[in-house]
Amino acid sequence: AVKAVLGAVVARKGPPAKVDVWAGLATCDGTRRLFGELEDMTGVPVIPLHLPSTRTAEAAGYYAGEMEAFAGSAVERGFSEGWDAARAGAYEAAFRRAAGALRRAALSGRTGPVELTDLLMDFSAACPTGGDAALFGRIERAESRERSPTYRVALLEVPGAPGDGLVPEALSARGVGMVALGCGGLWGIPEGPPPPAPSPGDLAREYFEAVLCARSRPNDYVFARLEETVAETGAAGLVVSTMRFCDMWFAERLRLRTRLPVPVLVLDRDLSPAGRETAANRLDAFLDSLEASL
């Protein structure tokens, strides 16, 4: 996914060609080192930021401070005219209203896995105050076409390259429902209304505490939330799909299988044809075993 973005940036094609400044958000040293290269290759400034992978109160405070500093730096460097708290509150309120339907779809497991994945990906780049009526119409139609799957599988996945829908495609082919977790799904949408006039730190803290993904270090808090969500959705199994360079969850696969009350498959993936074939075979075997046990 990083290489795909870099290719588009260097080729100056698509949305990356229109960027005036990058907010470089990284959880690991490998990505942080990329930012200097990105600035050198494109001539576009990069403001580096660090996203702690461990979810704790201290880390939330650190991240809130990072976002406050980022907003100040953007003003100092002439990229922003300043933070408009009222406008930020209105934007966030519109975003959460629109995201509510997607949250319900991600939680229910009744919207088709491929369609749900496409909607979540499109929504991540949508502007809720910019009249994205076509997208919101698609969300409403997806809700109205809710189906009754044979069973549901929860998916916690690192967002991959567009079109890499290995797990959603496999679930869809079997008529299985998908409960989409992670930062691109249910766990990427905070619940409840935002503050009416939030500061950058207010929103950063709220999102840091609410949003979990496969890059979040699996400490006791994350495990407890995962157990709670799996029980709440009635998922019959859990698939954790991470990239090979991001192995925090793969290292915890034994604890996952011990603590979760449902069967668990942990995929340690790459995007090569051989890697995709191996992951597809393991996923098929897991679903066969899961169906045999129901």
What are these regions (language model features)?
Residues 1-74, 82-83, 178-185, 189-294:
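Trp/Phe/Arg-rich N-terminal binding region typifying the photolyase-homology
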Residues 64, 68-192:
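A charged, amphipathic alpha-helical module
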